[in-house]
From Swiss-Prot:
InterPro entries per record: Ribosom_uL1_bac-type (IPR005878), Ribosomal_uL1 (IPR002143), Ribosomal_uL1-like (IPR023674), Ribosomal_uL1/biogenesis (IPR028364), Ribosomal_uL1_3-a/b-sand (IPR016095), Ribosomal_uL1_CS (IPR023673)
Protein name: Large ribosomal subunit protein uL1
Highest rank taxon of the organism: Bacteria
NCBIfam families per UniProt: rplA_bact
Length: 232
């Protein structure tokens, strides 16, 4: 068994039998198991009682993690004139209009978040088949179609996380790095869970939050107590 295999086996043994534990216990376990040479991402996955194929059961939104994500987020902005200048001044990595559309159509997508002013949507709309599957399509419901370009760019750069339920009703996201303190990770996890809780759709039937798992990039997952994670 190689080093990585032994490391994973040891990490798995450490979490064996530990289910429905508190956020604090889970974070301590994951940090203790993180022995890789790179800074692992701590990821959360939540199984929700929704069928996102129905419009009244779609779950999506954003949350500003209090301690950021630890990741460098590359932001693209579709804008012209003063708004393009505002985006650049706010720290956007790529700013453009038709030229940016052509770049994306050509298959070059060197950004993690996409923002657009409302007047740019006829252009951005042509990129739906490219941006949509990557969850990069600007949307007014999550604040990425806006005239307040400065605020949107700063939020994206400052640790704002977007979430959206997938077909199986699962929401997942990175909530920090293994190098974060336990307190920082706990705070981020609780902020994310709270945001998903508040995004409960009108069509959700039965138990909304069914399972919550926390894992690191190279480690096994641990099951959280839903009651503890939600503060109920």
């Amino acid at each position: 068994m190689g080093k990585m295999g032994k490391r994973f086996a040891a990490a798995k043994a450490a979490v064996e039998g530990k289910e429905n534990i508190t956020v604090e216990e889970a974070v301590a376990l994951l940090k203790g198991n993180s022995k890789t040479k790179f800074d692992e991402t701590i990821e959360i996955a939540m199984k929700l009682g929704v069928d996102p194929r129905h419009a009244d059961q779609m779950v999506r939104g954003t949350v500003n993690l209090p301690n950021g994500t630890g990741k460098t987020v590359r932001v693209a902005v579709f804008a012209r004139g003063p708004k393009a200048e505002e985006a650049t001044a706010a720290g956007a990595d790529i700013v453009g209009a038709e030229d940016l559309m052509e770049t994306v159509q050509g298959g070059t997508i060197e950004f993690d978040r996409c923002i657009a002013t409302p007047d740019m949507m006829p252009i951005v709309g042509r990129l739906g088949k490219v941006l949509g599957p990557r969850n990069l399509m600007p949307n007014p419901k999550i604040g990425t179609v806006t005239m307040d370009v400065k605020e949107a760019v700063e939020a994206a750069k400052g640790g704002q996380v977007q979430f959206k339920a997938e077909k199986a009703g699962v929401v997942h996201a990175g909530v920090g790095k293994a190098s974060f303190t336990e307190a920082q990770l706990v705070e981020n996890v609780r902020a994310f869970v709270d945001a998903v809780s508040k995004a409960k759709p009108s069509g959700s039937k039965g138990t909304y939050m069914q399972k919550i798992n926390l894992t690191s990039t190279m480690g096994p997952g641990v099951s959280l107590s839903v009651e503890n994670a939600t503060g109920n």
